[in-house]
């Protein structure tokens, strides 16, 4: 029996395009195991796939396939939604996500991928442990930067006295793409240089 691609990606390590050499041109992450690890560390995962006018669903329980991929209805657009419940037996300290931590990462991803639109919905409310012990209200934040890393440099230098407009250049060959943006300011900081590979901060 042929296993659907979505099931392979969620249950087998190194099954992503990063290891095929020609799977995709741009990737995010380091090891190519991300979503399969999320599945392994979750008590439950639901995946909905919309394509070719139909919607499909597959369910997982503690990393194992619970319900095979099956059609559940019609779809008027394409896309994939992954919903996961972190396993409290593994993450004994907490399974509560901090809004500010997630927002910072999504903002960074939007800066690094020019034009990418990330919409963050936090539907939690009246839960004392959600945000640093303060009650949270439902909120939505959209991250999209058409200037890419030029906008990132401007964001990092907000409030500083800058000496020039951001300088930007890029280069591309068969092995990949390099982008550089820089701007001088009157302030000094040891964190003034940042580097990323596959959208990951290399510190």
Regions found by a protein language model. Name each.
Residues 1-5, 16-147:
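GHKL-type ATPase core
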Residues 9:
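Short basic (Lys/Arg) and small-residue
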Residues 6, 79, 177-181:
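Short glycine-rich loop/turn motifs
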Residues 12-13:
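Mobile ATP-lid/nucleotide-binding loop of the nucleotide-binding subdomain
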Residues 100, 108-109, 115, 119-203:
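GHKL/Histidine-kinase-like ATPase module
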């Amino acid at each position: 029996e042929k296993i659907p691609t979505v099931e392979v990606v969620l249950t087998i390590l190194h099954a992503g395009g990063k290891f095929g050499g020609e799977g995709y041109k741009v990737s995010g992450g380091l090891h190519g195991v991300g979503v399969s690890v999320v599945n392994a560390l979750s008590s439950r995962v639901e995946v909905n796939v919309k394509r070719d006018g139909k919607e499909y669903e597959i369910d997982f329980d503690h990393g194992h396939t619970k319900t095979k991929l099956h059609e559940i209805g019609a779809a008027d657009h394409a896309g994939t939604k992954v919903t996961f419940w972190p396993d409290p037996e593994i993450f004994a300290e907490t399974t509560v996500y901090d809004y500010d931590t997630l927002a910072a990462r999504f903002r960074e991803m939007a800066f690094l991928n020019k034009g990418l639109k990330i919409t963050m919905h936090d539907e939690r409310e009246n839960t004392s442990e959600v945000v640093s012990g303060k009650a949270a209200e439902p909120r939505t934040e959209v991250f999209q930067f058409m200037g890419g890393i030029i906008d990132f440099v401007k964001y990092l230098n907000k409030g500083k006295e800058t000496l020039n407009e951001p300088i930007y250049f890029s280069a591309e060959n068969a092995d990949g793409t390099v982008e550089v943006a820089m701007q001088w300011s009157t302030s000094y900081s040891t964190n003034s240089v940042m580097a990323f590979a596959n959208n990951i901060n290399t510190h």
